[in-house]
Amino acid sequence: MPEMFRYCGQVFQVHKRAHKTCDYSTQYPYRTRWLANTVHLQTRCDGEAHDGCQAGCLLYWKSAWLKPLGKRRDSNDRKGTQAPSFPGIVPVRSQGCNETAIWDRIRVTDPVGGSLTYICQMTQVRQATSALAWWDVRQYLEDYTSGNVGIATLCKAFAYSVYYHLSQAGIGLGPAMRWFYDRVNPLRGGTLFPRKPGEIPEGSPTPSGLLNLRPGELVRVKPHLEILKTVDSSNRNRGMYWDAELVPYCGGAYRVLKSVTKIIDEKTSRMIEMKNPCIVLDSVICRARYSPCRMLCPKEMYPYWREIWLERVEGQAGDGPSAEKSMRLSVREDRQGQKTIPQLEIKR
């Protein structure tokens, strides 16, 4: 995509191996799909070439577009077009392209209705991937062997998944298991049971709150139980879903990264203009810990927050974790037992 051009020639460390990724083009619950020969670097799309889409998606990089440091070749060396070899990634030979062709493919206008649709990495996930069953154990082995997550994170994710499915099995254990989770897990530094329904009856209006937040302001995420008072029994506030992946951030203090008013819808490939702006918080990402059909997905999408779920913090952060501390702790936890991650240069 044109948004990737500015990274060419720069050096980055591999952030995650993108052997699987979430597919948001289908109906909920979303699922993961296999993705070959791809990694994530710490690079995000700024949406400049896609009419200012503000989703800020983590970019996918094919191995053919990268080369390991220490193995640079002269630009006149034709062998330099060969894809590098990384552990667990099958090299493929590039077929070639040019910037004009890329620019020509980012917008498509319907010749009949005149509606505009967009082509980007996110709208093409289904075309670039293959089906992956949530129970396919190979994906979890690669989560660990690739260095995406450590053994502790993997075990915690499996433990929660088993616990959750037992609580939902309809054998009469659900209420007791959720009560036990709420009493014991906070003693271990964890959260309340993350998948609780909202308190407002479905179909009833949900409240709004307006803080007029600006980038750089410090906010605190309200407690989980307080947020449940603002969402209906399907966990939505004016259409926006309150997801279990947001629960670990409750009580934490974070900087506002941006206010989001428009994004490209991955289902329709059309630009969505939001009726109510939502907030993205710095260093706050989806870690796919509590989503059984997409567990440990490395996509790291930015979650969206209603302002009514946040409260402005005057001065410095309080007793909740800061964004920087939260990110350091989560990365450290994710990467316990990881192998050394290589640095790569993006080809020009």
Name each region found by the language model.
Residues 1-87, 93-97, 101-185, 189-215, ...:
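Basic/aromatic-rich interaction segments and small domains that mediate binding to polyanionic partners
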